[in-house]
């Protein structure tokens, strides 16, 4: 089941949106964000909506709704589903007109709420990708823009062709940036490490939340330059992201790993946080 808020009303199903000559489809000026509803909570929904507005502005468009209004719209959509359903909440914006640059006065918007079960935390495998994340000099890396995901899709497709679920992507100078679909964490001797944000990947909202929760629980967390060798030699590797929240990595290249105590604590802390309030804030 899915509902979409378009043109001031909710529509059920999967309606067509973009015209044949739309700037969004032609030049790729589409931005979106993703939040989750599950078990009756919507953790960090306010932060996802605020990032959506920033992403729209970063691509030279104009969001027709303020962040607080997006929160209310999202919750309105969530209430159309049974409380126990796991949902994906996705605001999206694009420009209809413009040539190279979008015309901000023609910014279009849709907010989608769809049934989307959370992935089971069974673990995933990953290999090193031959594709790299772009730098801010060549792409709008500060925005959650659809144009970035063709590169992530190439990395994921390459990994699946080799028999892996996901890929570790490096930044332009060869340091680890993230997984193709989520932020990357590793643990070594009980200490947590994660690549420092350097404008080549999104400093994820779930990533920031997990860092704060782990530090609050007494863990030492270092945001630093991470090499692929660090990942290969880690005791634990796990991912954070809106779609799957906190998930363990069970194989890096040919090295098998077990979900460890740091991962387990991170997931436990995140679920406790998510249930701490109606929006997890």
What residues fall within each predicted segment?
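Ordered, amphipathic secondary-structure segments that act as subunit-interaction surfaces
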Residues: 74, 83-93
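Helix-start/capping segments and mature chain N-termini
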Residues: 1-76, 94, 102-281
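An exposure/low-complexity boundary signal
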Residues: 81-83, 100, 255
